[in-house]
Amino acid sequence: MAIKKVGILGATGTVGQRFITLLSDHPEFKIAVLGASARSAGKPYAVATKWKQSIAMPKEISQMSVKACDPKEFSECDIVFSGLDADFAGEIEKSFRDANLVIVSNAKNYRREPTVPLVVPTVNTDHLDVIKYQRQENKLDRGCIITNSNCSTAAVVVPLKALQDAFGPIAQTNVVSMQAISGAGYPGVSSLDILDNIVPFIGGEEEKIEWETRKILGSVNSTISGYELTDNVVSAQCNRVPVIDGHLMCISVKFAKTSPTPDQVREVLANYVSEPQKLGCYSAPKQAIYVFDDSTPDRPQPRLDRNNENGYAVSVGRIRSDSIFDIKFVSLVHNTVLGAAGAGILNAEVAVKKGLM
């Protein structure tokens, strides 16, 4: 397979930096262009950014000249990954698609568009098939927009997908989140607000989980031109907690028909295999869902489990019967890997494998 040249929009931000760490030694994708704001354009990357990752900035990246977020600067790229903030992403990403470029976006702006795939790679890569209709609709032969989910949504939909496939439709889902501060970007939440504290509000977050879950767990329509939302009714309450990385979610599920036992749920989750695994994608986890049994009742924990499978796995524990719903459990996702940049990369890997780009 020929190596794909890729670009990164918002390369100096938190998500952009995570894209760089995950792509710097990727065997199939090579970083060709870094894009950021006008004040960063023209500067060496090492000068333009405040590097906040736990591993060193790759040497070959540090001296790359940052470009403006202009499609002309990215014309050589096969794929452009966007880590842009939603305040800027809408117009810029559309201009890239209109220039016949492939955009894989972490921003919320196009997630609700009828012909734009909203994909968590270990859940619903079949939704990528609608790319063909999106191109037809916009009279493009190559350009398109693909979005990945909100970071917290990923922790919800991966286990729900496995359960839905095994036990049939889910009627109701209740979610209470404990979300890491890196989800707010840099500089993010003030230390005076988060130290010795929990903030029981994250603007827009609950609505994202409630709606995105229904699109992701839904299906492609009969004409492969859009999506049918699932009937699952989702209620979410979101909290910011003093953890750097890793969103922990307490989830309760009521099924429309079958009510499985905790042991049945454990078995289904442990044996779940996603399409990226079947396709042999480079970034695909060997185990999509890590399952903790009753011998480890205090897991998963962000500090101990967020890096399972290099952050591409979801970890699930405390699986129990629920007196109001049917089943309850705790789910953990690395919010900047499977919940952000990693999802975009794995989505692109799947799209390449399927001949969609």
Curated annotation (Swiss-Prot):
GO terms for cellular component: cytoplasm; cytosol; nucleus. It is found in: Cytoplasm, Cytosol; Nucleus. It catalyses: L-aspartate 4-semialdehyde + phosphate + NADP(+) = 4-phospho-L-aspartate + NADPH + H(+). Its EC number is 1.2.1.11. The modification Phosphoserine is found at S323. Keywords: Amino-acid biosynthesis, Cytoplasm, Methionine biosynthesis, NADP, Nucleus, Oxidoreductase, Phosphoprotein, Threonine biosynthesis. The active site is at C151 (acyl-thioester intermediate), H247 (proton acceptor). Pfam families: Semialdhyde_dh (PF01118), Semialdhyde_dhC (PF02774). InterPro entries: ASADH-related (IPR051823), Asp_semi-ald_DH_pep-lack (IPR005676), Asp_semialdehyde_DH (IPR012080), NAD(P)-bd_dom_sf (IPR036291), Semialdehyde_DH_NAD-bd (IPR000534), Semialdhyde_DH_dimer_dom (IPR012280). NADP(+) binds at T12, G13, T14, V15, S37, S40, L84, D85, G183, N335. GO terms for biological process: homoserine biosynthetic process; lysine biosynthetic process via diaminopimelate; methionine biosynthetic process; threonine biosynthetic process. GO terms for molecular function: aspartate-semialdehyde dehydrogenase activity; NAD binding; NADP binding; protein dimerization activity. Pathway: Amino-acid biosynthesis; L-methionine biosynthesis via de novo pathway; L-homoserine from L-aspartate: step 2/3; Amino-acid biosynthesis; L-threonine biosynthesis; L-threonine from L-aspartate: step 2/5. Belongs to the aspartate-semialdehyde dehydrogenase family. Catalyzes the NADPH-dependent formation of L-aspartate 4-semialdehyde (L-ASA) by the reductive dephosphorylation of 4-phospho-L-aspartate. Mediates the second step in the biosynthesis of amino acids that derive from aspartate (the aspartate family of amino acids), including methioinine and threonine, the latter of which is a precursor to isoleucine. This is Aspartate-semialdehyde dehydrogenase. It comes from Schizosaccharomyces pombe (strain 972 / ATCC 24843) (Fission yeast). The lineage of its organism: Eukaryota, Fungi, Dikarya, Ascomycota, Taphrinomycotina.
